[in-house]
Amino acid sequence: VPYTALPFATAISIQHQVPLILRRKEKKEYGTKKMVEGIFHPGQTCLIVEDVVTTGSSVAETALSLQEEGLLVQDAVVLVNRGQGAERALSQKNIRLHSVLTLPYILQELLSEKLITQQIADETKAFIQTHQSP
């Protein structure tokens, strides 16, 4: 997903010795002029890597771009899932979302370390519940 998760995706690529491809935000007028950059072949499976998801729309847009190039997209991994409906939205597009951390978990850890108050944790949870994606 352009471009915030690039360091995370690069680390995964290096650690697991798998190719890295990148979806651009917009097509450049120079170079390859492609939206999807990297070495790949139609029919290959691709894992989407994202830093934070809220609604899942960025992951869905990336999946569509990759599918248009002939790649198979079944899974996405995210560093932080805010818990606002991305998992549900992506499952409707047959994409499994795997979260390293969830916002409720982060809140609980911050609370247990006394880095936030119960009031802040409760207000944040209430905000998440009232601001779910459709």
Where are these regions (language model features)?
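Generic alpha-helix detector with strongest preference for long hydrophobic helices that associate
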Residues: V1, K27-Y30, G43, L47, ...
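Short glycine-rich phosphate-binding loop at a beta-alpha junction
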Residues: V1-T4, V77
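Generic hydrophobic segment detector
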Residues: T4, A9, P19, S57-G70, ...
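A generic "binding-loop/recognition-motif" signal
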Residues: T4-A5, E26, G83
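Short, glycine/charge-rich flexible loops or terminal/linker lids adjacent to PRPP-binding catalytic cores
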Residues: F8-L47, T55-E61
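PRPP-dependent phosphoribosyltransferase catalytic core
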Residues: L64-P134
